[in-house]
């Protein structure tokens, strides 16, 4: 009895141990996290891809910007999209923006294309005999705009004709800025001059001029990349921006090349903005963006004529022939009242940065290149150099401010050092009107902290482009995201490889500010936008390339457009390759068998999915991405190996496959072969037996020979006639004929097979019956065990509740009793006082 009791106790303890072990396993796996791959998450990083340009250029226009943009840019998108990114803060830095460098390179290409040299002017590097030119048909009216006679020189020189050993004398008009005296720069009485750049650089003449008016150019990011735009109205170009959107292309930017003043740019939306890389460093330029335009109207009133001088076969030098009428100076007019108001507002903004000093403006310091000392810009093909002293000397003039301008034809190219170009003159008078939208300033150095002096500057055209690109940055979309979830990849069957959904486009970034849990819900919509974006953009690029293939023959722009197209395809293939290696092709959410390591991030599941954005999460685990990628790849490799092993055992995956109807014919064929083999063996052995007996001298009379057989012991012997007793043995007849013999063998084989199969079925039935009976008994035992423990738990709970109720009731009674005693004591206080007083009186 004691042994049985111990056995029962051990069984009970064993059951309890199994139960607790199961609960422990469940609890241990409840919070276990696994790596999950997400495709289409709103994550990006800064990048420097090759941008392409878009413009509304007109192929029939001869204006050089139109000609350049026609074969350099694709058509603009008629329906540009801009997606707001809520709850997103992004850092911008206009001073370290690769878009500026790309635009700088592009505008250099534009100018090289526009001012393409046709003729080298090296033969003009000869002695020029020059005199002051007074013009023809001059009225000699002395006005403020009449040019000094020394401003334009009439020079004669010897030049080679079409026949190289022959020379002829020609004359041409040159501006004073384009020639230098041979006897020294300060010698104004000299009559011998040379071209200004003959000793420093090669001079080439541009092709005959056409109109020169910049058109807006949009810069666009290739598929797989996006352009982020800062929409803060007071953004100073550096630091965080809280109002961010994403666009495919920038706004139209006019590539105006100018110094000191910024022309035809964009305006600040609210107040004037001051931008500088380090405003306390006087070596850094200050870019001022105005909030209102100031119109500037420029003109060259002279009625010039143009003539050509032949310098040899196929070479012509274009120069000014005559100036009809008074030789009047080129000039620009600005409203003094509006300019002074603008300058005072700029002062107020500068005082916010230099609170202790007095802000003053002064003209540039003398000395240096004319491009820096004056406001240089291109007006209808002529290069104007205007003196801005009247703008920055703070005279307070409210009338029209007239800026005197000089024109140069030999230009130092701003895009290349040591290169000059001769710009042929434009016939007739020239007029152009522009809007001043900003200015470039420099601050004087020194220790004077009470007076801050600012002067106009410029020269580095990158600052011109920065004034327009300050609010943009290019980012590379990272569509693959990794995050921990409670889901684990369970299946081992091979997944069907679906077609991928394409590379990420800018459209889905609208969910960038959402939490990871909210953003993951829209993955399908995002991925579809990505695919449509890349397909549409690639189609536009290809259509533009096909339309312009005669202009894109191995040019830098054809290569750039093709590079942008190939870059998008490369991004797509790279992402799809990773998804394929991880076994996630065609999936937006893909679970893995890689457990999440808390060393990567120890945040809980709720903290990650309910409080963090994908960008914040990417920064959290960015250093471990390569490690996680490697683990996912190793896990997928192991899974594929397991799949291969499983496929090798696939024939034994299910016993029901043995009874498949498609295999019955194969079973029948095997059965017929076995029966035929048995019959053949029987015939062969019968023939061999007969042959053997014949060789021994025995010849059977018939196949019906009787074979004696013994009679059973319980059967009486038969009595023949005459009462003679027969032998105890009897004979049975053999079957007659070959077919009968075969049939008898087949019948015996079938009977044998039937008996064996019946015995096998009986054995299997008994085994199954015993197994089912045992299983049923086990289930009944488990059910009784569950009922027993349920009843025990119920009784324990009831007992616990009863005990708790009794304890609570006892405690309540005690509390009530204590309260009653305290109440009675309070009620008896007056009586006790009275009794005490009575005793004291007695």
Swiss-Prot record:
The ranges of region (Immunosuppression) come to 560-578
Tell me if Transmembrane helix is a UniProt keyword of this record: yes
- What does the entry's free-text domain comment contain? Some of the most genetically diverse regions of the viral genome are present in Env. They are called variable regions 1 through 5 (V1 through V5). Coreceptor usage of gp120 is determined mainly by the primary structure of the third variable region (V3) in the outer domain of gp120. The sequence of V3 determines which coreceptor, CCR5 and/or CXCR4 (corresponding to R5/macrophage, X4/T cell and R5X4/T cell and macrophage tropism), is used to trigger the fusion potential of the Env complex, and hence which cells the virus can infect. Binding to CCR5 involves a region adjacent in addition to V3. The membrane proximal external region (MPER) present in gp41 is a tryptophan-rich region recognized by the antibodies 2F5, Z13, and 4E10. MPER seems to play a role in fusion.
Which residue intervals make up region (CD4-binding loop)?
A: 364-375
Which Pfam families has this protein been placed in? Answer: GP120, GP41
Which cystines does this chain contain? 53-73, 118-207, 125-198, 130-155, 220-249, 230-241, 298-332, 379-432, 386-405, 584-590
How is the protein altered post-translationally, as described in the entry? Highly glycosylated by host. The high number of glycan on the protein is reffered to as 'glycan shield' because it contributes to hide protein sequence from adaptive immune system.
Which stretches of sequence are listed as region V3? 298-331
> Which GO molecular function entries does the Swiss-Prot or TrEMBL record give?
structural molecule activity
Sequence segments annotated as region (V5): 448-457
Q: Where is this region: MPER?
A: 648-669
Q: Where is this region: Fusion peptide?
A: 498-518
The record's section on Gene3D superfamilies has:
1.10.287.210, Human immunodeficiency virus 1, Gp160, envelope glycoprotein, Single helix bin
**Lipidated positions for S-palmitoyl cysteine?**
750
The coding gene here is env
Q: Where is this motif: Di-leucine internalization motif?
A: 841-842
Q: Which GO terms describe its biological process?
A: clathrin-dependent endocytosis of virus by host cell; fusion of virus membrane with host endosome membrane; fusion of virus membrane with host plasma membrane; positive regulation of plasma membrane raft polarization; positive regulation of receptor clustering; viral protein processing; virion attachment to host cell
**UniProt motif YXXL motif: location:** 698-701
> Has keyword Plastid?
no
- Membrane topology, Extracellular segments: 32-670
> Which species is this UniProt entry from?
Human immunodeficiency virus type 1 group M subtype K (isolate 96CM-MP535) (HIV-1)
Name of the protein in its database record: Envelope glycoprotein gp160
């Amino acid at each position: 009895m004691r042994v049985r009791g111990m056995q029962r106790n051990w069984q009970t303890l064993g059951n309890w141990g199994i139960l607790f072990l199961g609960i422990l396993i469940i609890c241990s796996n409840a919070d276990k996290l696994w790596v999950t791959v997400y495709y289409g998450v709103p994550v990006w990083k800064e990048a420097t891809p090759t941008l392409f340009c878009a413009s509304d250029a007109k192929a029939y226009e001869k204006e050089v910007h139109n000609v350049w943009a026609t074969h350099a840019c694709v058509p603009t998108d008629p329906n540009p999209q801009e997606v707001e990114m809520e709850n997103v803060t992004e850092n911008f830095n206009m001073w370290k923006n690769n878009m500026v460098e790309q635009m700088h390179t592009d505008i250099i290409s534009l100018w090289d294309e526009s001012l393409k040299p046709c003729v080298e002017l090296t033969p003009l590097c000869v002695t020029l005999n020059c005199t002051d030119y007074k013009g023809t048909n001059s009225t000699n009216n002395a006005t403020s705009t009449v040019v000094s006679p020394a401003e334009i020189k009439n020079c004669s020189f010897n030049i080679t004709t079409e026949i190289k050993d022959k020379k002829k004398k020609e004359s041409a008009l040159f501006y004073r800025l384009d020639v230098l005296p041979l006897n020294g720069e300060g010698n104004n009485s000299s009559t011998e001059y040379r071209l200004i750049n003959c000793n420093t650089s090669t001079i080439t003449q541009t092709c005959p001029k056409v109109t020169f008016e910049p058109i807006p150019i949009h810069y666009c990011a290739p598929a797989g990349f996006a352009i982020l735009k800062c929409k803060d109205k007071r953004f100073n170009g550096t630091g965080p921006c809280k109002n961010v959107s994403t666009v495919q292309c920038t706004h139209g930017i006019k590539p105006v090349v100018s110094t000191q003043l910024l022309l035809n740019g964009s305006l600040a939306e609210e107040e004037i903005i001051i931008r500088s890389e380090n405003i306390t460093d006087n070596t850094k330029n200050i870019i001022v963006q105005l909030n209102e335009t100031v119109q500037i109207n420029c003109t060259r009133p002279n009625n010039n004529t143009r003539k050509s001088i032949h310098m040899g076969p196929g070479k012509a030098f274009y120069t000014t022939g005559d100036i009809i009428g008074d030789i009047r100076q080129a000039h620009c007019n600005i409203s003094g009242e509006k300019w002074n108001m603008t300058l005072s507002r700029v002062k107020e903004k500068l005082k916010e940065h230099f609170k202790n000093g007095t802000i003053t403006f002064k003209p540039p310091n003398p000395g240096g290149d004319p491009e820096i000392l004056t406001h240089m810009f291109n007006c209808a093909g002529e290069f104007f150099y205007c003196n801005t002293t009247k703008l920055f000397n703070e005279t307070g003039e409210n009338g029209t401010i007239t800026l005197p301008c000089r024109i140069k034809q030999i230009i130092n190219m701003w895009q290349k050092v040591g290169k000059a170009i001769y710009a042929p003159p434009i016939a007739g008078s020239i007029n152009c009107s522009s809007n001043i939208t900003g200015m470039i300033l420099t601050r004087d150095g020194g220790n004077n902290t009470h007076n801050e002096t600012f002067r106009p500057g410029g020269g580095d055209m990158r600052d011109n482009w920065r004034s327009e690109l300050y609010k943009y940055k290019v980012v590379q979309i990272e569509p693959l995201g990794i995050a921990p979830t409670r889901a684990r990849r369970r299946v081992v069957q091979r997944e069907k490889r679906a077609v991928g959904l394409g590379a990420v486009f800018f459209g889905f970034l609208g969910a960038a500010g959402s939490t990871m849990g909210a953003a993951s819900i829209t993955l399908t919509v995002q991925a579809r936008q990505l695919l449509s974006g890349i397909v549409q953009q690639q189609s536009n690029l290809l259509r533009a390339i096909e339309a312009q293939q005669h202009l894109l023959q191995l040019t830098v722009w054809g290569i750039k457009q093709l590079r942008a197209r190939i870059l998008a395809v490369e991004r797509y293939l790279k992402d799809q390759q990773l998804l394929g290696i991880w076994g996630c092709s065609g999936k937006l959410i893909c679970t893995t068998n890689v457990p999440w390591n808390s060393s990567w991030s120890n945040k809980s599941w709720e903290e990650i999915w309910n409080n963090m954005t994908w960008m914040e999460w990417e920064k959290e685990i960015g250093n471990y991405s390569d490690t996680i990628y490697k683990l996912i790849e190793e896990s997928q490799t192991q899974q594929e190996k397991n799949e291969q092993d499983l496929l090798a055992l696939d024939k034994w995956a299910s016993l029901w496959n043995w009874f498949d109807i498609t295999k019955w014919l194969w079973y029948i064929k095997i059965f017929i072969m076995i029966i035929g083999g048995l019959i053949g063996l029987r015939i062969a052995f019968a023939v061999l037996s007969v042959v053997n007996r014949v060789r021994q001298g025995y010849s059977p009379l018939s196949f019906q020979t009787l074979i004696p057989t013994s009679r059973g012991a319980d059967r009486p012997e038969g009595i023949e006639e005459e009462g003679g007793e027969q032998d105890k043995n009897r004979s049975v007849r053999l079957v007659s004929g070959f077919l009968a013999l075969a049939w008898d063998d087949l019948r015996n084989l079938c009977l044998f097979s039937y008996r064996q199969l019946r015995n096998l079925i009986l054995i299997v039935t008994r085994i199954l019956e015993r197994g089912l009976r045992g299983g049923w008994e086990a289930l009944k035992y488990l059910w009784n065990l569950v009922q027993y423990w349920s009843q025990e738990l119920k009784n324990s709970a009831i007992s616990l509740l009863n005990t708790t109720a009794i304890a609570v009731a006892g405690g309540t009674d005690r509390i009530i009793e204590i309260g009653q005693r305290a109440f009675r004591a309070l009620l008896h206080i007056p009586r006790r006082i009275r009794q005490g007083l009575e005793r004291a009186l007695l």
